[in-house]
């Protein structure tokens, strides 16, 4: 149920002051949910906010280099990756981003992500066709944290959940 980001938005709109949906809200989070449930009965339990879901596997430069060589993939390292990515996206290109540890849970949060410009009205269809994805698979915007309140309505009520793509908000 809570994997449905639109339902999570509607829950907030019923009057909740704040909502946090645990990022691994599917089968892979069952053990975490069970642990939180048991701990919630302990009066000394003091939960802390989650700061990262980059808990999956990561690979050394040597392991990556070995696979790149074996698959004969061309690789180049830009001097300024952010600037290079922005330039590719501005020209309508698509970027596959692979860095650090993989995300734990069902959402691509930037370490295993495909980036594309949202200004192309056909981009959802294009990506779905290229990736063999179904039409209803969600896409999410990336924006700077300092711009969030200006861009998204009621973001203050769900900001922590939004960082993990577990809720939607309307755009301003």
Question: Language-model features: where?
Answer:
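Flexible beta->alpha loop and helix N-cap segments adjacent to enzyme active/binding sites
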Residues: 2-172
């Amino acid at each position: 149920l809570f994997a449905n980001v639109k339902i999570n938005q509607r829950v907030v709109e019923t009057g909740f002051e704040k909502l946090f949906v645990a990022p691994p809200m599917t089968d892979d989070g069952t053990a975490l949910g069970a642990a939180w449930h048991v701990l919630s009965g302990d009066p000394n339990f003091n939960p802390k906010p989650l700061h990262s879901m980059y808990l999956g596997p990561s690979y050394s430069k040597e392991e990556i280099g070995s696979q790149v060589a074996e698959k004969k993939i061309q690789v180049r390292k830009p001097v300024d990756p952010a600037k290079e990515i922005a330039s590719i996206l501005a020209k309508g290109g698509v970027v596959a981003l692979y860095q650090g540890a993989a995300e734990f849970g069902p959402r691509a949060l930037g370490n295993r992500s495909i980036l594309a410009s949202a200004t192309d009205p056909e981009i959802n269809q294009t990506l779905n066709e290229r990736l063999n994805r179904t039409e209803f698979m969600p896409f999410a915007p990336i924006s700077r944290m300092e711009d969030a309140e200006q861009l998204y309505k009621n973001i203050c009520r769900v900001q922590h959940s939004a960082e993990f793509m577990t809720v939607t908000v309307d755009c301003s």
